[in-house]
Amino acid sequence: MGKIKNKIVRQQQYMKALHQKNKDKLERRKERAKEEEKDPEKKRLRLSENIPATIESKRVYDETIIEDKPDEELQAELKDDEFSAYFSEERKVPKLLVTTSKRASRKCYDFASELLDCFPNAEFRKRTGDIEVHEIAEAAAKRGYTDLLVLNEDRKKTNALTLVHLPNGPSFYFTLSNLQTAKEISNHGRSTGHIPELIINNFSTRLGMTVARAFQSLFIQTPQIQGRQVVTIHCQRDFLFFRRHRYAFREKSNMPDGIGTGLQELGPRFTMRLRMVQKGVWDRKEGEVFFESNAGEESDRRKFWL
């Protein structure tokens, strides 16, 4: 076909060949459907082998991936890590301090207000003067706070979140994207002040477990089930999706008991990406960096850290 010099004739020949190719493909599919109708085992075998390749299935192996049953060494580490007091019989109660970057906008304050509603036993303090994050963390630890959450803003857009576990770290720095407050979510509900359930999903590495335990330590471990509220932090390809919903029960005639269930989003919703972990209290200049992943520097799309 490439030897045909006339453009119009060449296009006609190409379309004719393409039509014949599609026709043959359709005939093969019809023939295969007839065979599979006679022998269902052929269809089952074909579908079992026809598994599409995804980034997750081609994931680069990470030796820190945690199996379904953690080994004794990992269990010993978890018993002595910075968050162990929240998962032991002691059931330490978290106390979170929320603040913002200097001279934050109204939208950032609105977002902070909604976070206070998400995290039980959280308080907000407006940031004044030139006090730095490590100084705020030191003062907060003396006043009995267990965690510090700082919202960062750039050009009146909330773009990052710093989470510091008190009094001695670790500290986590996340970039934020796709932020929507409750009033920006269509048909959103209103929270009732109950302690929510927490769903942490798909954290599979040792670093991922540390991040998951950091978020778990922000919530009281005894949710008030009657409130029917749930906070979900879902990890997919190292993106952390934050959502808050309420279980809703509605009358449905097609259900056996006449009642159907659903979810009503309460907000806010946003996406996080872990960029840095420091071993101690957050200090941008002198902090000891344990993990760092800068935007745009990912060498392999199949490599996941969490």
Swiss-Prot record:
InterPro entries reported in the protein's UniProt record: Brix, IMP4/RPF1
Organism lineage: Eukaryota, Fungi, Dikarya, Ascomycota, Taphrinomycotina
One annotated GO molecular function: rRNA primary transcript binding
Domain (Brix): residue spans on this chain: 94-283
Region (Disordered): 16-49
Residue stretches of biased makeup (Basic and acidic residues): 21-42
Cross-referenced PANTHER family: RIBOSOME PRODUCTION FACTOR 1, U3 SMALL NUCLEOLAR RIBONUCLEOPROTEIN PROTEIN IMP4
Name of the protein described by the UniProt record: Brix domain-containing protein C4F8.04
Pfam families for this protein: Brix (PF04427)
Assigned GO CC terms: nucleolus; nucleus; preribosome; preribosome, large subunit precursor; sno(s)RNA-containing ribonucleoprotein complex
Biological-process GO terms, alphabetical: assembly of large subunit precursor of preribosome; cytosolic large ribosomal subunit assembly; maturation of 5.8S rRNA; maturation of 5.8S rRNA from tricistronic rRNA transcript (SSU-rRNA, 5.8S rRNA, LSU-rRNA); maturation of LSU-rRNA; maturation of LSU-rRNA from tricistronic rRNA transcript (SSU-rRNA, 5.8S rRNA, LSU-rRNA)
Recorded coiled-coil stretches: none
SUPFAM superfamilies noted in UniProt: Class II aaRS ABD-related
